[in-house]
Curated annotation (Swiss-Prot):
Record's function text: Required for insertion of 4Fe-4S clusters.
Gene name linked to the record: erpA
Family annotation (InterPro entries): FeS_biogenesis, FeS_cluster_insertion, FeS_cluster_insertion_CS, FeS_cluster_insertion_RrpA, HesB-like_dom_sf
GO molecular function ontology, one term from the record: 2 iron, 2 sulfur cluster binding
Lineage, uppermost ranks: Bacteria, Pseudomonadati, Pseudomonadota, Betaproteobacteria, Burkholderiales
Keyword Transmembrane applies: no
Keywords in alphabetical order: Iron, Iron-sulfur, Metal-binding
Annotated SUPFAM superfamilies: HesB-like domain
Protein name: Putative iron-sulfur cluster insertion protein ErpA
Annotated Pfam families: Fe-S_biosyn
Source organism: Bordetella pertussis (strain Tohama I / ATCC BAA-589 / NCTC 13251)
């Protein structure tokens, strides 16, 4: 009887990149149309501050840096710098409208705690 040996690669799967929802892309597209500058992209970043240690930020940017992560969705580009990306891997960037108002929302699986307003977190 012959033994069969099989090699199995047990490496962890690569991290899930950011999820940029259709709703968020549509809202950004509307905002960019209002700005009237086709070169603008949405930059999402993480910086120190907020009540939980880190906070999210959004800004429009014309410049794509060499080390940026770029996500394209529905004709909209989302930019994330490398430092921020490490905190956002696997996160979902969404836009919601409900009775509490309308806002961009980041659902981040890396955040161990978040504040009530949802704009700051800790890891």
């Amino acid at each position: 009887m012959n033994a069969v040996t099989e090699t199995v690669d047990l490496q962890a799967p690569p991290p899930v990149p950011l999820v940029f929802t259709d709703s968020a892309a549509a809202k950004v597209k509307d905002l960019l149309a209002e700005e009237g500058n086709p070169e603008l992209k949405l930059r999402v970043f993480v910086q120190g501050g907020g009540c939980s240690g880190f906070q999210y930020g959004f800004t429009f940017d014309e410049v794509v840096n060499d080390d940026d992560t770029v996500l394209d969705k529905a004709g909209v580009q989302l930019l994330v710098d490398p430092m921020s990306f490490q905190y956002l891997v696997g996160a979902e960037i969404d836009y919601k409208e409900d009775l509490e108002g309308a806002q961009f929302v980041i659902r981040n699986p890396n955040a161990s705690t978040t504040c009530g307003c949802g704009s700051s977190f800790s890891v």
